[in-house]
Amino acid sequence: MISRRTFTGLLAAAAMIPTAGFAADMPAPFDNAGDVKIALVRYLSTGDFFQAYLSGVEKQADAIGVDLRVFDSRQDAALQADMVDQAIALGVDGIIIQHGLTESMREAAQRAVDAGIKVVAFDVDVENAAIPQVEQSDRDLARLALEAALEDNGNEFVAGYVYVPGIAPLDRRDETWVGVKAANPGINEVAMFGTLDNPIANSVANQARAVLSANPNITVMFAPYDEFAKGVKIAVDEAGMTDQVSIYSADVSTADIAMMREPGSSWKATAATNPAVVGEVSVRTLAMLLAGEDPGASVIVPPTLITQAMLNELDIKNMEELGAKLPAFAHADVATPEWMPLPAR
């Protein structure tokens, strides 16, 4: 568990800047923000997306000035539920549940609500009307990526599909894939595979090697999570099939950008939100609840389509340049009441 506290009021007074006056205008309990404790309880943490998400959570917590505790269950569902109970026992004011399984999180989330704690869920359906769901608009992520696949390859192709059921964002992306296949009967899905075993990319690469060997006629791989796409690309490269197979994915990171921009790369497009921005929105949504405001049952962060051609044309090499050259990617005007301080840009 990581513990951190930001003494915003003391820093503002020492620096003699107007931040302290701004903080005084914040609603309770943020008029004494350093006394507010929130917890981030994570199910998934491996990979660039989750590191960036955590960075966004930390930056927004810093901007508000709250005490953030981070619990990482490392894909242990029972441990994640226990960590919610640990956060309750610590007397936190709010909890962000990041990913997880509905069956293990449903009762744990309800225990937190029963204890008077405000709860927000990101990409896990805890089936609780009192808990807002922060989403990346996963159906739109899948739709944008698949529209690119259809534009590049037509509506008749042989496809491989990477999917692990039971994870809310992947399930929502799967709904879109099922719909696209139904609307385009010329799409022939010959293989579905996937794993969340760590390291995810290497584990998926092992599966993809076997899939490509058994199905050398595959021309499109839909891998709607960037760690899946990394694994598929490893296998495609090793099989010498970069000219034959095109990969379409969801999510993005600096490492992904580098792989997409490799000469002749098979990774053609990804649809993504900025994971750091999603982390910021998660904290802001929780802060609104704590201030007695209603962020809505569903808080949606809109995605952007990022193509290999776009990255090359704009010479984008990392996430910082992506945000600078695509401003819509750098910030989401979501959960931003007037009193809410934002991280420095």
Named regions from a protein language model:
Residues R4-T8:
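N-terminal export leaders
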Residues A23-R345:
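A residue-level marker of the well-folded mature domains of exported/periplasmic proteins
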Residues P18-A20:
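N-terminal signal peptide c-region/cleavage motif recognized by signal peptidases
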Residues M1-I2, I96:
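Absolute protein N-terminus
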